[in-house]
């Protein structure tokens, strides 16, 4: 028994010694490309959310093997891009790009078969790389679904010889459902992987307009993690800026100058539902949405729905003309200073159209909803049977 215990103890010591000899100042990737064909060059690309750049390159050996040793200032997303000789980095096709996450001390093994049309690859030695591979499966699955749907729609449109609104109405619900399903699947992956960088990179694929409350909450959960990763910290700072004007928070008060030169305060709408509608006369999407806003105002104003239009125009005459032309009969104000106005800065307006719906208690209850989504929200809020 003593000899057996000694042998086990010696094995543990040997294992500890081997691991202690690993180089923690850099990470290593040992790769194998089976059936490489014309593929000769491999590029290591740093690809976090702040930059994308080639940091190293090498040539495949005759046996399809390659190796990278690279110092990572922090755990980060990288891509392996495999291309043909003489074609440069751009010669690599989209299917010959593989994601991984690496940090110093990682000893990663990578392999793929160039003859495999599914572009399956195996990666060992990095749990985060396995997770980013899992996320890519989700992304590719829904991407392929919508690509097929778009191709089918385009084929039928070509047969008709024109784009058809009725045909679009047939395909659009499925397209939107696929996007919604994708968002739900990604959000689940993100919340299941809060301690992994893979979760963060998945989160950056979500539309902040549609998933703002979830992304703000996620940012709070991870801000103590990955402190040395600039991409993560930039995301955290962005969410902290948005948070005060995110859904569920009190809308910050402001005073804006009305079209008649008199001050308008958000506090004037205390106890009422009001939509802050940020727009401009020069904004084509805003002008396209205005007929819908006019329609909803006509339907719900008598039920308690108010609008305060806030223009990003600098030209008062153009602003006034757009109000008259589009028949916008609600109150209007502007700082006449585009995105640099104090109201726009307070509400972190970076694109228009943008809107905030505020309830009688002064809470932001919806943001950036347009078209049918705006009508559905108002129907639900004011208990109108659809």
Where are these regions (language model features)?
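Bacterial Sec-dependent N-terminal signal peptides
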Residues: 1-32, 383-386
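A non-transmembrane, solvent-exposed segment enriched in polar/low-complexity residues
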Residues: 21-174
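N-terminal targeting signals for export/organelle localization
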Residues: 95-97, 107-108, 168, 176-247
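Thiol/disulfide oxidoreductase modules built on the thioredoxin-like
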Residues: 205, 328, 335-383
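N-terminal "domain-start" segment that seeds a small globular fold
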Residues: 234-266, 330, 376-384
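Conserved redox-active cysteine motifs that mediate thiol-disulfide chemistry
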Residues: 270-271, 278-295
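Structural microenvironment flanking redox-active thiols in thiol-disulfide oxidoreductases
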Residues: 287-326, 336-345
């Amino acid at each position: 028994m003593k000899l057996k215990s000694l042998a086990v103890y010696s094995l543990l010591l040997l294992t500890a010694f081997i691991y202690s000899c690993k180089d923690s100042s850099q990470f290593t990737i040992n790769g194998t490309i089976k059936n490489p064909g014309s593929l000769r060059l491999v590029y290591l690309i740093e690809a976090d959310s702040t930059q994308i750049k080639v940091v190293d390159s090498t040539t495949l050996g005759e046996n399809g093997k390659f190796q990278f040793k690279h110092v990572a200032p922090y755990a980060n997303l990288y891509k392996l891009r495999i291309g043909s000789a003489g074609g440069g980095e751009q010669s690599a096709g989209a299917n010959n790009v593989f994601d991984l996450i690496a940090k110093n001390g990682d000893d990663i093994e990578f392999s793929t078969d160039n003859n495999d049309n599914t572009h399956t690859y195996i990666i060992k030695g990095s749990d985060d790389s396995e997770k980013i591979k899992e996320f890519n499966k989700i992304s590719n699955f829904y991407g392929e679904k919508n690509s097929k749907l778009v191709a089918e729609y385009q084929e039928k449109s070509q047969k008709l010889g024109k784009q058809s609104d009725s045909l679009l109405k047939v395909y659009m619900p499925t397209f939107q459902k696929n996007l919604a399903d994708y968002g739900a699947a990604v959000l689940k992956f993100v919340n299941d992987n809060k301690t992994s960088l893979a979760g963060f990179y998945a989160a950056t694929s979500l539309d902040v307009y549609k998933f703002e409350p979830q992304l703000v909450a996620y940012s709070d959960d991870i801000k103590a993690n990955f402190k040395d990763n600039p991409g993560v910290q930039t995301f955290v700072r962005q969410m902290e800026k948005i948070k005060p004007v995110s859904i569920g928070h009190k809308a910050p008060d402001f005073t804006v100058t009305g079209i008649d030169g008199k001050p308008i305060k958000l506090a004037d709408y205390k106890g009422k539902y009001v939509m802050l509608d940020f727009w401009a006369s020069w904004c084509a999407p805003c002008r396209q949405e205005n007929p819908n806003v006019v329609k909803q105002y006509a339907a719900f104003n008598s039920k308690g729905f108010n609008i305060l239009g806030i223009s990003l125009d600098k030209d008062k005459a153009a602003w006034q003309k757009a109000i008259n032309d589009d028949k916008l009969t609600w109150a209007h104000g502007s700082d006449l200073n585009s995105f640099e106005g104090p109201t726009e800065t307070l509400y972190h307006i970076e694109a228009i159209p943008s809107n905030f719906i505020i309830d009688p208690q002064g809470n932001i209850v919806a943001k950036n909803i347009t078209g049918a989504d705006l009508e559905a929200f108002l129907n639900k809020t004011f208990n109108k049977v659809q």
